[in-house]
Amino acid sequence: MAAPGDPQDELLPLAGPGSQWLRDRGEGEDEAVTPKGATPAPQAGEPSPGLGARAREAASREAGSGPARQSPVAMETASTGVAGVSSAMDHTFSTTSKDGEGSCYTSLISDICYPPQEDSTYFTGILQRENGHVTISESPEELGTPGSSLPDVPGIESRGLFSSDSGIEMTPAESTEVNKILADPLDQMKAEAYKYIDITRPEEVKHQEQNHPELEDKDLDFKNKDTDISIKPEGVREPDEPAPVEGKIIKDHLLEESTFAPYIDDLSEEQRRAPQITTPVKITLTEIEPSVETTTQEKTPEKQDICLKPSPDTVPTVTVSEPEDDSPGSITPPSSGTEPSAAESQGKGSISEDELITAIKEAKGLSYETAESPRPVGQLADRPEVKARSGPPTIPSPLDHEASSAESGDSEIELVSEDPMAAEDALPSGYVSFGHVGGPPPSPASPSIQYSILREEREAELDSELIIESCDASSASEESPKREQDSPPMKPGALDAIREETGVRAEERAPSRRGLAEPASFLDYPSTEPQPGPELPPGDGALEPETPTLPRKPEEDASSHQSPAATKGPGPLGPGAPPPLLFLNKQKAIDLLYWRDIKQTGIVFGSFLLLLFSLTQFSVVSVVAYLALAALSATISFRIYKSVLQAVQKTDEGHPFKAYLELEITLSQEQIQKYTDCLQFYVNSTLKELRRLFLVQDLVDSLKFAVLMWLLTYVGALFNGLTLLLMAVVSMFTLPVVYVKHQAQIDQYLGLVRTHINAVVAKIQAKIPGAKRHAE
């Protein structure tokens, strides 16, 4: 296809892969490049047989144009290993120009030659068979021709031939790698993404094509006669469906820092006559800073819509559109600040964009922190200018993604870039640019994967917590494992404070422990002191002290096995519950009444009997005085005995009753409130019941109470109150034990007594009219 400029310009033919397009300078001014083994290009008016009708048609147009018309400039595309086809043997672009009005096509040629760098070349312009024809570069004989080998031709080490917003970059290729790719059909199929680039005409120049129908006919005839050299690729569009190319203007001063190709008008006559050698290309993905594009647009706003128009200040660019994606993980955010061109809106580049989009989608699967392999030091030093303009690291091609996807590792692991320059080069927009790249080739997308910093920090925290917990477990061995796992490790300062607090409490309870350790009579020194807890070790790191329990006397332990149905001693008390009084405890009273501790029960039972018999013989005042004298005589005698014993043995054991002296016998407010409430309940209940009986709320109940009082008159005449109290105490200490031993017989007799009593009550109720009606 061709892109006509203005009436003074010639159509620009598109060169397919494996073919070379050449336009010789007219009137014998310049000579074309004559490769080894190829036929020299003829002068104007003498087309060579190798070029056929194409060269003859060009010569005739050139001869008839005259000085008023400018000779056309053709852009030429070639691949490695092509020999003897046209005037340019085995490299990409070669153009010639005729002196005219000063407007011509810009060439993609650099006259600066550098030593060949075989190790830094890639080639991705793959050729393949189409429509049953074989292109020239696929000929095995020509690929094996010694004259066409790439090492004999010096490479061009331009670090960016030109750049555009489409971002396709050219890289020198190596002949050995090209032969390998061409020989392998599988690699040839995988590299279809780099086959063709569609350069078509924009809509704004269609009217110019209508003004020159004969030029269009000549150009179409010119292409039809050249089908034996260049076969039209499938990816190239027809003229009726153009994908316009957006022309971007880049000034000369923006391109001074890199070795860009000079323009045609700037070339001298010697340079035009000299053979121009170029290198094959590789299409890679790079990025351009938006600032450069903005500067370019501000400086040349009126030339944004010029598409391949002959001018010394223009550089043709090729735009390969990519689908915009607003997702956060997208590497191709929507373009801003510039209107999308026709090629961008259509998104139908002749480069296999299915493969390119597949590569972009695969890159989307990764995070923004896609790792880039470290660049060589030499390459970083050689490309300071390119870093200022180039974008983020090279996006891997579809071929490279097959290898990089296998190395991506676990999807949960973030990819962190090891190259510090990757963060500086990270830009939001992706482009494709043409240009010769020197130095070592860009490394394929095989990022070195490492764990993210956050994950490493988390693992370090877990390790430190495990170490702290192990240390705490060793220092506090009595703590339960569940508490060690659930509760966070405590600091040493908190543990020290707990140890000091427990130590102070242990010192306060020490006298009470020693007092309970010594044997003494509970009858002589009854106490209502709360039960003290055992002392905690000063160095114990346990947070929960053991619950204090009352020590069991030997008598109680000896009598505990006598009754299997009897309940054992009092259990451990809760930390918040106030300890009850010694002789007012319900469990303690049950143990005394059931004679579970014979010695203790005997002492208590004997003391009660002595007191009651004394009261029967003497007055209460006399009994209290005598009991006090007896207690004092016992304590004083024991105190003197201990003092004499310590003097004789020359020991200093201290006061014999020191433990009891330090024992606190005060009642707490909670204990007083507890027993006061209980007493209040019984007092109130008794008063209510007496009121109900005496006020005859219920006649039957009142009569029963009257009968009870009549019987008590007989009991009072026979027994004294102290005798009754004595009989009650004896019954309390004897009846429970007798009932346990003879429970079956007692229950039988109690049943008979209950039946007899019920019969008597029934007879009495039958004789009382009011009681009978009440029973009904």
Curated annotation (Swiss-Prot):
Keywords, comma-separated and alphabetical: Endoplasmic reticulum, Golgi apparatus, Membrane, Phosphoprotein, Transmembrane, Transmembrane helix
One BP annotation, GO: neuron differentiation
Spans annotated as Disordered: 1-103, 136-168, 204-244, 285-580
Bilayer topology: Multi-pass membrane protein
Sites of Phosphoserine modification: 327, 350, 352, 487
Main location group: endoplasmic reticulum
Transmembrane segments: 603-623, 705-725
Modification after translation, per record: Phosphorylated.
Alphabetized InterPro entries for the sequence: Reticulon, RTN1-4
Annotated Gene Ontology cellular component terms: endoplasmic reticulum membrane; Golgi membrane; neuron projection; postsynaptic density
PROSITE patterns to which the protein is assigned, alphabetical: RETICULON
The Reticulon domain, residue ranges: 589-776
Xref: PANTHER family: RETICULON-1, RETICULON-LIKE PROTEIN
Function: Inhibits amyloid precursor protein processing, probably by blocking BACE1 activity.
This protein's name: Reticulon-1
